[in-house]
């Protein structure tokens, strides 16, 4: 699975495979691109655990009102922290094993992961500015 991301610098449309490693860069001008993708039970390991970047994992469901409040903040974090973060959305209705793996009791649940290991958790709706501050703080901490 791949996402098409338009470079904000040069306008080039770039194909970003969900499971790629490293940093997403524009094929034309080489600046860092925002990396927002999705994962399922079947591809979670490749998309998330293998990532060399910290991952903002958004565990959500389409029927969840607070999840819709959080979604713009996740997208904003991916754009603002391009090259420093990979944002991955997981629909818990379609990926129950991922939700079980991280012991998700309520949604939205936001996790910061490094190599698949949880380093921070936020449960419940968070306004976009507060979410961005939280993510910046969590990814700036040295890996344990």
Model-found features: residue ranges?
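Thiol-based oxidoreductase modules, predominantly thioredoxin-like and allied folds used
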Residues: 38-39, 59, 70-97
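Short linker/helix segments within small regulatory modules
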Residues: 16-24
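Non-catalytic, surface beta->alpha helical segment in thiol-disulfide oxidoreductase systems
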Residues: 106-107, 111-144
């Amino acid at each position: 699975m791949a996402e098409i991301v338009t470079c904000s610098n040069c306008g080039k449309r770039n194909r970003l495979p969900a499971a790629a490693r490293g940093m997403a860069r524009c094929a034309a001008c080489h600046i860092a691109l925002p990396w927002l993708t999705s994962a399922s039970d079947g591809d979670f390991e490749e998309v998330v655990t293998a990532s060399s970047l910290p991952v903002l994992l958004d565990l959500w469901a389409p029927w969840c009102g607070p999840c819709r409040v959080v979604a713009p903040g996740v997208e904003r974090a991916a754009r603002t922290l391009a090259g420093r973060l990979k944002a991955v959305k997981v629909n818990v209705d379609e990926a129950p094993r991922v939700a079980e793996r991280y012991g998700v009791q309520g949604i939205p649940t936001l996790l910061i992961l490094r190599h698949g290991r949880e380093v921070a958790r936020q449960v419940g709706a968070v306004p976009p500015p507060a979410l961005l501050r939280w993510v910046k703080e969590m990814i700036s901490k040295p890996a344990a």
